From Swiss-Prot:
Signal peptide: none annotated. Keywords: Developmental protein, DNA-binding, Homeobox, Nucleus, Transcription, Transcription regulation. The keyword Methyltransferase does not apply. It holds the Pfam family Homeodomain. It comes from Gallus gallus. It comes from the Eukaryota. Residues 7-66 bind DNA. It is found in: Nucleus. GO terms for cellular component: nucleus. Belongs to the Antp homeobox family. Coiled coil: none annotated. This is Homeobox protein Hox-B6.
Length: 84
């Protein structure tokens, strides 16, 4: 590609910086408060929705990597889905 911009082929591409920042946040917190999500969205020039989806995807990836999940963590995830 010639122009470097967000490739809108149905899938969001994140810059290396954005990915690193999101990974760093995820390392400390797998779940974001709405306030924190807004802060991150502003600092990374992303939408809240993008942050939310990135974290959802990241948690799914994390789950696959950590098959041995305690039931307490699973119930916390269910609570978040219904709190939408």
């Amino acid at each position: 590609g010639s122009s470097f911009g967000p490739a809108r082929r149905g899938r969001q591409t994140y810059t290396r910086y954005q990915t690193l920042e999101l990974e760093k946040e995820f390392h400390f917190n797998r779940y974001l408060t709405r306030r924190r999500r807004i802060e991150i969205a502003h600092s990374l020039c992303l939408t809240e929705r993008q942050i939310k989806i990135w974290f959802q995807n990241r948690r799914m990836k994390w789950k696959k990597e950590n098959k041995l999940l305690s039931s307490s963590q699973l119930s916390a995830e269910e609570e978040e889905k219904t709190a939408e």
